[in-house]
């Protein structure tokens, strides 16, 4: 996984003629309740993200399926749109890479309507997680 992902990142950097900044978690805000973990960020200047990168390194049969469809698999749309929301960018590149097959590189545009509908679901999920953490913390304190 990680070795192939490094190869994919290098391929992308050459194909797009850009530097790819590796990073860990990126937080939506200082509260740090919502984050994403991009496989790379493309910066116009330090701290000025212009695009993100999501890399998938599927098995050969899955890569062939992706290539034949020529589209981003629907299961990755929430991840890509959510990452654009968190990083506040208008595009995110999806790269599906297998070392023995043609890469699939698609630029996904930000969908503000999708993000608007996603925010309440995300906030509800985060609230439920926080409630669960609080309950566990109180149980441990009581024990």
How would you label these PLM feature ranges?
Residues 1-143:
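Accessory terminal regions of nucleic-acid processing enzymes
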């Amino acid at each position: 996984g990680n070795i192939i992902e490094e190869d994919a990142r290098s391929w992308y950097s050459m194909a797009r003629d850009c530097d790819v900044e590796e990073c860990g978690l990126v937080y939506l805000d200082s509260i740090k309740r919502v984050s994403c973990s991009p496989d790379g960020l493309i910066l116009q200047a330090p701290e000025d993200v212009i695009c993100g990168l999501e890399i998938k390194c599927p098995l050969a049969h899955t890569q062939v399926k992706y290539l034949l469809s020529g589209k981003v698999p629907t299961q990755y749309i929430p991840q890509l749109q959510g990452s654009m929301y968190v990083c506040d960018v208008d595009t995110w590149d999806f790269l599906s890479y297998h070392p023995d097959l043609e890469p699939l590189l698609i630029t996904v545009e930000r969908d503000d309507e999708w993000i608007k509908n996603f925010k309440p679901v995300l906030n509800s999920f985060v609230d439920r997680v926080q409630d669960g953490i609080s309950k566990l913390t109180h149980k441990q304190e009581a024990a």
